[in-house]
Structures are given as structure tokens and as C-alpha cells.
Amino acid sequence: MAPAVAGGGGRRNNEGVNGNAAAPACVCGFPVCACAGAAAVASAASSADMDIVAAGQIGAVNDESWVAVDLSDSDDAPAAGDVQGALDDRPVFRTEKIKGVLLHPYRVLIFVRLIAFTLFVIWRIEHKNPDAMWLWVTSIAGEFWFGFSWLLDQLPKLNPINRVPDLAVLRRRFDHADGTSSLPGLDIFVTTADPIKEPILSTANSILSILAADYPVDRNTCYLSDDSGMLLTYEAMAEAAKFATLWVPFCRKHAIEPRGPESYFELKSHPYMGRAQEEFVNDRRRVRKEYDDFKARINGLEHDIKQRSDSYNAAAGVKDGEPRATWMADGSQWEGTWIEQSENHRKGDHAGIVLVLLNHPSHARQLGPPASADNPLDFSGVDVRLPMLVYVAREKRPGCNHQKKAGAMNALTRASAVLSNSPFILNLDCDHYINNSQALRAGICFMLGRDSDTVAFVQFPQRFEGVDPTDLYANHNRIFFDGTLRALDGLQGPIYVGTGCLFRRITLYGFEPPRINVGGPCFPRLGGMFAKNRYQKPGFEMTKPGAKPVAPPPAATVAKGKHGFLPMPKKAYGKSDAFADTIPRASHPSPYAAEAAVAADEAAIAEAVMVTAAAYEKKTGWGSDIGWVYGTVTEDVVTGYRMHIKGWRSRYCSIYPHAFIGTAPINLTERLFQVLRWSTGSLEIFFSRNNPLFGSTFLHPLQRVAYINITTYPFTALFLIFYTTVPALSFVTGHFIVQRPTTMFYVYLAIVLGTLLILAVLEVKWAGVTVFEWFRNGQFWMTASCSAYLAAVLQVVTKVVFRRDISFKLTSKLPAGDEKKDPYADLYVVRWTWLMITPIIIILVNIIGSAVAFAKVLDGEWTHWLKVAGGVFFNFWVLFHLYPFAKGILGKHGKTPVVVLVWWAFTFVITAVLYINIPHIHGPGRHGAASPSHGHHSAHGTKKYDFTYAWP
């Protein structure tokens, strides 16, 4: 039996595919079946029926926060007359909603807080501060923005949805007894741009995990896009293809999890529940040795290539000053980027390259050889076929805008169309590997369900390894993935976040959905006039939204429209007739069949090179109406947005064990630049023609709100910086945001803060995250707002006003510290950047402000401790949120907390002592009579102020 998969993003650590109790989990974190041996694999088919029935009870829920949606009201419901318990009539995934005991209070509290906040703002408007009108006006604007941004963030969370794939039903419908499958084809795109900054071993592990995934071999094709065009990347992939002939059969024989070799061999224990434990131990020892040799070859490739090239250049009589070519192992010159770059062989100037490392496998199973002297591993009962693997380095020429990752993805889309043309595409970053071998099947469940023909893409959450245990900079970001994205699944679906996303190919070609229903699974009738049939696609009865698919006609009979079989003029797709001919075949293939695999011949490869040419996209729709959208550094968000405004939906797929795992930048500088890139891209979308304010009426109203929030959140920096500095400075100036609070002020403030905390508790509950993660998320939000968000606003304003392009460096995945001594050494390596200036200033201002307040109380200028305490508490609230930032720029691991506290205390004491002992700072008032009440003058003419402050 295959490893069980369940939704919930880690909430169900021990559940089956439908949330039912699964077998006891191994200490490695995977279900027992993930470590089962050949005996378990061999018996899976014979016991499939019992396993399927046991794993797939509709409505079976094992989580206290979720309950199954009433299928009679869902767009995933079986047609009338279906038998509830019949396996063939069960959907391939089930939908859950939050229990009313959590959802109803959650919605009510949002309404209550909105009213309380409105009354609070009204009170603030009515009670002006005549002594500092600029302060009053600015604070009102800030409070209004905070309330507005909170509402933008909260409204899309009114209807969270959880979907759980049923892999048992999927296997029953699509897998056959002879080992073949009728699952649709799947092209997997992996992108890399620099084999130095993005370690080539990580890329190789990503490729190996894809080749070993549990998906029909003849339906799975892997494409690697190398934007550097370097021979190092190609030869590393060639080595990976060789090692895959051993690694992939080993994974299949013993049902290994995870199937990235680096992660697998790093497991502290390797429990095995099969019958052939001794054989497994011997096989594992052999494979481990081969993997160590493989890593040694990968790490030595750069030296080997340079040495080989020097030898060939010397043999060719290349003189000093002449271009020195980089040579392949077969004695031919590399057509891409050379080690010593020269004309036509630079990173931005080289020919296009398409090389097939592993060709299309046959449809029939191919068993491996038995154990022998030359082959110590017995693969006689294992299918040893490997998926197709293709290396692509698109052509680059000076004067052609290559559009970074978006351009690479579009080039891969065209190249894959002429080579494999699978109806579905999965994209992964090179530092992400498949952690759960069932991930591809789990994602495809959401593409093959009833009414799933309107689903454009399935987004998986991003999970990371190598993050420090305290997650100092909120790299996991589960509040966003398991909270926001899961909530959006109750509307039109989650946004596209750049990696771990499964696409329907035709959505990238500009096709529109066959139907439009913006209501979502729990509100199928929401949208009224917006829910309608756009056009009828062949193969589907359009009599009702829940119609079941009927036998589809051949792809060649796709309905002909204004532009033939294409949704827009042929010239919009480029000059390749071969590519244009693939579009109708991919436009609506039967979900129950896949195109026959065809060997990639020389003509097909030549065509793939042609469609990846640097000038191919000129005067076409690529980057605007077709493919990944250009014009922003966050091409992912705007690409998903363009699909949503056409009426397409998306789905969120969170399974356990996690589908994909990547590497996160744990260094503060790299993390800030990563957030700067994201926030800059969001603002670029806001100031472009893709502004969600002007999207089509096919966008769900609350989905539009979510996109507005995504494209405007960096503006928070302008108001947050004001609120994190002015209150502290008020201790020095004596002018405060609120001078005379009343009882109603405190009542409104208490309700606003209290409801916020309760809402956070409820959200933490249904999202399955911890309170600690919620706090960490808030802390890094403060750091990012004071640094990266502000920089993003300044950069985009500069771009809009002065028409200057924005460029970013590639986020480095290489550690700066000594990982052997400390795996988190990179966390505390200080790399100075201008993004750190603002948070440092805010920290100093709040420490100094608190010290001045303390000094004024000791000096007798202020006599009301309680009033001072409120402001000092807010200052320390700011410092608490910036503590991870301070910890990152001071000291070493384990010593940092002491260093930070000592510096804070030192600055505080020095400021207080200076204020008390330097007369000209505070004037002569401290030697006069006792301080009078607020608003009056002392005997020496110094005006006194009581302290009060409004929480933002």
C-alpha cells in the first residue's frame, strides 16, 4: 500500500488519505507503509480493494476543527442516484469546512471589531489635539489605514475550506492490474539560474526525487531550465541520470520515503517493516556508498571541466588572449556559457540548447536484472524504467529582454509542448524536492474531480528544512500558507506563489473556463449573474454545474472558433507551426487518457530549440496574454491573477508528509532582500494594468479584496514607522497622540484589542498552527515593515516617476558559516545592508524615549506612574517585536540574548542619567514647585503634560 496522504498542512500527523486513523507512524515521520519493503509493495495490488474501502469513508473526520461539507450542496457532489458507499461514485477528494462552533464566533467577532474600530476612529476624529494638529491628522490617517488593511486581510477568511485527496479512489479509477495507468501526462519544470549560488547538489536531488516519484513513468517528464547555460549544470544532471538507474529502482523496491537521497540518508533512523529486512540493510548500504561517490563526482565537476577544457585548448593550440572554449566529455565544444566567457558564450549571450538525458520510456513495465557479481542489487521484481529527462538552456542574445524566471518558464512551456505536451504542468524551484512520493497523485486528484475542468491550478504550501528551531525570521510562514491560502480555497482559490504549483496547460495558452461559478463550494450560487456557461467544451454535458463527464471525443474534434482551434490568433503564439498544432491536442484531452509517449527525435529537438530562441516572443502574446506574465518581479502572483479574472478557479493542497520541501534563507540580509523582492513585485502589480481594482466581473468579490490586500500591504510601512517612533519621541517633546482620553476611549480600545486577540486564537485553532508561530509571524512583520516594505515603496515610486527598471540579485542558497560545526551558523553571520538602518533607528528611538520617560518621573516632572507606564509598555511592545532583528545583528548563537539585553539596558541607563544631569535638556523646571496639573504652567514657565497614548 502506498503512503497515506491527508490534508491539513501537518495538522494530522497520523492520518490516512481521508483523515481516518492510519497505521502507526515510524520515527522518521512517515506512515509505516512508507517504509514497507518489497513484500508490502507486491501485496498492494492484491489487497487494493480492502485498502481502498477502509481508507475512503466520505465524511470521516479526525480533526476537531473541521467537518465534511454537505455534498448535496457542493459542486463536488455525486450525481443524483449515486450510491453513497459505492467506490466508483465517490469523489477523488473530499471538502471540509470549519465547524460552526468556531466559524460563527469568528465571523461575529470580525463584525464586532469592525464596529468597535469605527466608533474608535469617530471618537478620535471628534477629540482633536489643538497643540499638535499635524500629529493628530497623521495618527488618524495611520489608524484608518491599519483598520482598512486589517479588513482587507480578514474578509477573505470568512469561509476557510480544507480539501483532502482520496488516493485510494484515484488508484481504483486510473491504475490497472497489469501495472499500467491511464492517469494524464505531467510535465515537471525545474528552474535554476546559477549553479554557484544555487548548489548543484540540491538541484540534482530535486531531479532525483522527481524521477523517483510515485507517478506512471510513461506519463511523467522532467525538464530542467538552466538560465546560466553552463556545462557544470548539464554534466551534473547527466551524473544524476546515471545515479537514477540505481536510486529509483531502490526507492520502488523498498518504498523509500523521502525520495530525495540527501534528505533520506540524513534521517537519524531508517525503520523497516518489510519481511526482507536483511536485504534492505544490504541494499541501503550499497546505495549509500554509491551516493557518496555520486556526491564526490558532483563536487569535483567544476575542477574536472576546467582541467578537461585546459587540455583540449592546449591540444588545439589556443594562445594567450584567444577565446578559451569549454569542452564536453565527448570532445565537442559547449555551445552555452564558457568558463572564460567570450562572445557568443556568455551568460547573456549564447545559443539555445536542448539535450535529452533520458528518453521516453516504453508503456510496458520493464523488470530489472537479478542480483549478480556486476549488479549486487536484485531488481528482478522492480520496474526499472525512468521518466524522460530533458535539459534546456534557452537562447540569450544582447538586446533581447530575457524576462528572468517568467521568460524561462514560457520557454519551457513551448519546448515541452513539442516534446511531450502533457495536459498538466508542475513547476518547482531547484532547491525544492519531492518529499512525499504521493504528492503528484494528490495534486492531480483536484484536476480530475467533478467540475474540476474549471480549475486552473493547484497550489501546494511551501515547506522548508534547515530553518533554525526558533524560526527567528518566520521562514515557515504557516500563518500565510495554512491560514490565508486555505481560506481563499473557499472563494476562487489560493493565489499562485511561484513554486509547488500544478497547472492545467491550456490556462497558460489563454483559454477560458467552460463554466464560471464564482461562489465556491460552500456558496455555489453566490455571484448570481456572474455564474454562467461561457461555452461548451466537447466531452462535457453542460446541463448543470454538477454534470458528470461523458466519453470525450478525440482531441482533433475540439470546437472551432473565431481563430480556428486556438483562443486567439495563431501569430500570438509565435512562428512555430509545430507548437501551434500541439495546442488543440492539449486544449481538452480526456482526463481518463494520456497521449502516447513518442521518442524525442532530432526534428522534435530542433523544433524545441527553435521555440526557445531569444527572438521567438517578439510581436507575440507571450508575457501578456499567454504564459507567465512579464513586467513584475513577482510573475507568479500576476499570472495566477490573470487566470482568476477569466473565471478560472484554483485549489489548495496540503498533505502530510509534506509534498515538497525547500531551502529557506535563514540569514537576516538574504531574508530581507527576499521580502523586498516580493513586496516590490506586489506594488508593481498595483501600479500596472493588472491592478485588481479594475479586474473583470468574473473575479469573486472577496477574491478581489484578497488581491487588493496582496498588492497594497507594503504601504503599511509608511504608517507603521510613524507609530513606532512618534510615541517614543513624544516623551521628549511633550506632545502626545491622545491628550485627554475618556472612559469610552478605553472601552473602544479594549474591544478592538480584545477581539483581535480572540480572532487570532480562533485562526490559530482552525489553521493548525501554534501560538508561537503566530508571535514569530508578528515579529517578522514588524521587521519587514520597517525595512523591506519601506524600501519597496521607495523603489516602486522611483520606477513609476523616473521610469527606471528594478533589478534584484539571486537569493544565495550557499551557507556563509561552518555548517559542520553549527548547521545554523549562517543565521548569525552579519552582512550589512542599508535595509537595516531603519529598524536600528527605531530601536534606538524607543530605548531613548523610555529612558527619558523614566528620567522625567525620577526627576519629578511627571508624577503619574500609571500614565507613563502605558507609553513605556508600548515602547517595549515595539522592542519585543524587533527583538529577532536585534538578535540577528548582535552576537553569536546562544550568547545573543545576553548581548541584546545588555546593550538595551546600557543605552537606557546612559540616556536617563544624561537627561537628569544635563540641565539644558530639561530646563530649570525640576528645581521649581511641584508639577501642576495638565495644561497649566509651572512657576518657572515650563508647561507640563500628562501622558496618555492611543494604541494603534
From Swiss-Prot:
Q: Which InterPro entries match?
A: Cellulose_synth (IPR005150), Nucleotide-diphossugar_trans (IPR029044)
List the membrane topology term(s).
Multi-pass membrane protein
Q: Where are the bilayer-spanning segments?
A: 102-122, 132-152, 718-738, 744-764, 782-802, 834-854, 865-885, 898-918
Any one biological process term the GO annotation gives: cell wall organization
Q: Which gene encodes it?
A: CSLF6
Q: Which residues bind substrate?
A: D429, D431
**What sort of enzyme, by top EC class, is this?**
transferase
Q: Identify the domain of life.
A: Eukaryota
User: Entry's Pfam families?
Assistant: Cellulose_synt
Keyword Oxidoreductase in record: no
> Which PANTHER family does the protein's record reference?
X-BOX TRANSCRIPTION FACTOR-RELATED
Q: What is this protein called?
A: Probable mixed-linked glucan synthase 6
Where would you find this protein in the cell? Golgi apparatus membrane
Q: Which organism is it from?
A: Oryza sativa subsp. japonica
How is this protein annotated for GO cellular component?
Answer: Golgi membrane; plasma membrane
List UniProt keywords, sorted A-Z: Cell wall biogenesis/degradation, Coiled coil, Glycosyltransferase, Golgi apparatus, Membrane, Transferase, Transmembrane, Transmembrane helix
Q: Which family does it belong to?
A: Belongs to the glycosyltransferase 2 family. Plant cellulose synthase-like F subfamily.
- Chain coiled-coil ranges: 278-308
Q: Which GO terms describe its molecular function?
A: cellulose synthase (UDP-forming) activity
Record has Transit peptide as a keyword? no
Q: Main role? A: May catalyze both beta-1,3 and beta-1,4 glycosidic linkage on beta-D-glucan. Essential for (1,3;1,4)-beta-D-glucans synthesis in grasses and cereals (Poaceae). The mixed-linked glucans (which are not present in walls of dicotyledons or most other monocotyledonous plants) are particularly important constituents of the walls of the starchy endosperm and aleurone cells of cereal grains such as oats, wheat, rice and barley. They can account for up to 70% by weight of the wall.
Which residues are named in the active-site annotation? D227, D636
List the EC numbers from the record.
2.4.1.-
